[in-house]
Amino acid sequence: QSRRSIHSPVSLRNKSIRIKKESTISQPTILWFRQDLRLADNPALVAACEMGLVIPVYILEDAKNQQWSPGGASRWWLHHALLSLDKSLHGKLNIYQGDPLVILTELAENNNAGAVLWNRCYEPESIERDGLIKSSLKDAGLNVQSFNGSLLWEPWQVLKKDDTPYKVFTPYYRRGCLSKSAPRRPLAQPANMQLHKLEHSLSVDDLSLLPTIGWDKKMHEHWDISEEGAKDRLDEFVFNGIQDYREGRNFPNKKNVSRLSPYLHFGQISVNTAWYAANDAAALIDNESNLDTFLSELGWREFSYYLLYHFPALP
């Protein structure tokens, strides 16, 4: 069988996938980065590193495969987030563009991988895609695992007494989430990462994410698009901004606005890290309502994913 290019739009329909298995000792693990572009508190990364050699992969999906494509500002942020992640991975991030099922299947086959790991996404479109990928790779004999790296509580964990999902935020958050066990503590960055760079990886520039007109220049003055920048932003907010969050958040020019949204969206910091950073600073916060309001805003983020999960026609 001829070896196909990793970028070729090959249809896998009616094709039986067979991945050659050799000694499991030498088999690398493919780690698929998505909206979790960080090393700290990354459950899939931790699990992959425990297995041994890791092939870190990012795949920019073709627009034709997506119902919604990211806008210019999101693409600009993603460009710099990927550069930062690649630097954190010592230049070992493998970048591709196309259909994730085709690309992951070929990567597993060509590199004798034993497992493919990722952190879960919760939008209906992503769930459908990931389910297809997981079943296809499992049928091919691979160990496929997904983890919660995005939410404080899994959507299926928080239900009403009749086992139906909540539709109103306050009972969802107060009666549902807060009555559950506390969210897990953030995981440390793996101390030992054995990373493998492949020959045919694209570069971040190859993805053409940056705008052709330089409207983005002033944005660089206000954002450090990196995992370290996310940590600094969180620290600045917790120590200087959360004190008057309940009222100050209504004024975008004030320091009380957390400015964590893009970091959370692209996963450069985890919601668990934000949750516990705020909780651990409770002694420094004069008015408890400011802490409660910030945590409930993280709860609103949870509720959005929760509704998309339980009501997939919502979009």
Whereabouts are the PLM-identified features?
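Glycine/tryptophan-enriched, flexible segments
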Residues: S5, L142, T164-P315
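Trp/Phe/Arg-rich N-terminal binding region typifying the photolyase-homology
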Residues: R13, I17-P183
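Acidic, low-complexity intrinsically disordered regions
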Residues: Q1, P28, G72-A73, G149, ...
